[in-house]
A protein has these predicted regions:
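Conserved functional micro-motifs across diverse proteins
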Residues: 1-161
């Protein structure tokens, strides 16, 4: 597959998700948000406001020769001012996979292109001094200590709150 990040946002509000996904996913999105104990039922915001959500739009072209149900393994990383890499970001779900039981599995057809929103829960305080990435080798499950695939830098990450 080939992929590029086309948009990326940082927010503490799950209400912002509704502005990104197609209306057909609203009901499934609401169920997912309701399940998360770290999101306030009253405000829709993260209870621990030191944490954040990264909403990352990825344009993906599936270059495989056969249709597949692809499980996306991806983590968020940050390079902090000490120049060390940390893995504070966890993929919660992908917009087009919300209707599936597995929120990170998509059916892909050869030669087709997809615009997908990936929603990450990111632990720890956000800083403009850090550089943020997502794991770009979506099919390479890793133990986070030994990942050796490529990283996609989240350039122009727009901070909303």
């Amino acid at each position: 597959y080939e992929c590029t990040v086309t948009e990326a946002y940082k927010t503490i509000s799950s209400d912002f998700f509704y502005t990104l996904v197609d209306e057909q996913y609203y009901e499934a999105l609401e169920k997912e948000i309701t399940k998360r104990r770290y999101i306030s039922k009253d405000t829709g915001k993260l209870i621990n406001e030191k944490n954040s959500f990264f909403c990352v739009k990825i344009h993906l072209k599936y270059t495989g020769s056969q249709p597949t149900n692809m499980t996306f393994y991806t983590t968020g990383y940050s390079r902090q001012t000490d120049n060390l890499m940390y893995d504070p970001g966890l993929l919660e779900f992908i917009d087009k996979a919300l209707a599936n039981e597995e929120k990170d599995v998509l059916y892909l057809e050869p030669g087709k292109e997809y615009d997908l929103w990936f929603f990450y829960h990111v632990l720890g305080t956000y800083s403009n001094d850090n550089t943020y990435y997502i794991q770009g080798d979506f099919q390479n499950y890793n133990d986070h200590d030994s990942y050796n695939g490529y990283l996609i830098e989240l350039n122009n990450l727009i901070e909303l709150d």
